[in-house]
Amino acid sequence: MKKQQICILGSTGSIGTQALDVVRQHRDRYEIYCLTAHRQVELLAQQAREFQPAAVVIADETRYEALKALLADAPDIKVYAGAAALEQIVTADPIDMVLAAMVGFAGLLPTINAIKARKKICLANKETLVVAGQLICDLARQHHVPILPVDSEHSAIFQSLVGDADASIEKILLTCSGGPFRHFTPGQLQHVTAADALKHPTWHMGDKITIDSATLMNKGFEVIEAKWLFGVEASQIEVLIHPQSIVHSGVQFVDGSVKAQLGVPDMRLPIQYAFSFPERLSLKGDRLNLFAQQKLEFFKPDMQRFPCLGLAYEAIQRGGNMPCALNAANEVVNEAFRNNRCAFPDMARTIEATMAKTTFDALPSLEALLQTDAEARAIARGLLGAMK
């Protein structure tokens, strides 16, 4: 069997490191062609020594010399740096699939280039579909490229749809742990810190997505993702707070039946399923013990306390470049909150005000989306500055 060549965009992050564990378990099937990181040169070099890729890319050009020095005794591994290198490496002929696991807007252009180069896309970077869902889906159809979801929720929906047509979907059931502040009052939310928000009750993730989970913006992004991945309207996507995080999401069909995917919280499962689809491979890890589950609970989300979820619905219903503005403002306020420059409730207020001020474009091109991203970031930064 010819080994599939994988490029991992964001190999030092939470998804990237777990993807490498999947590769460790299936070295007979998969081989790493390229690893990339933002600025973690030590871990990237360590990964490169273990997996011996043809190339590594560090996005932060100031870290190039450090990475080069760490891999000085590995001359067969080519070392590159910068955004242009990231956008180019995904087009390399030997690559069969690209795991898009970079965080934020930075993952958009490499993913577009990978689609144009007809690489199978395993999508963990949700901002790509949030910002440019129509563009990405049109490109994927044009180039006959499959996009396999890596988010646990979208993988669960995808698995629930095996054997059924998208047209048979009545409703998507998108589950959500509720985050660490599910029981907090508005008054309590005013005083929570980034350290509080980073204590997610179920998943171990990167800092940015953990904050997004605390505000429920992450779930809002997943609503937008689901619209594009499964061809449904936002009104057909129902968010359910499910604190146990055992039901990862599901589908209600036109005949009233429901299919869902259950399992222990382990991101390696959706990563591996995206790699191996349509096959299902063995995976070492914990198994779900239903006898140990005393209850499975489901609640409606409170959009008054967590307005970011409502803002995401508003953005996708308005359409055009509004989801792009939503994402740009969110990246700004998320970083500000992590650096103690913004209170928890001010994140949603800033995002809402940014969306109101951003120039609307009903049919944005890629260039227009890049302009929207820059405009919305500037507006959000200005609003945060005015709050001081």
Indicate residue ranges for each PLM-predicted region.
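Catalytic, metal-anchored helix/loop core of enzyme active sites in primary metabolism
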Residues: 1-388
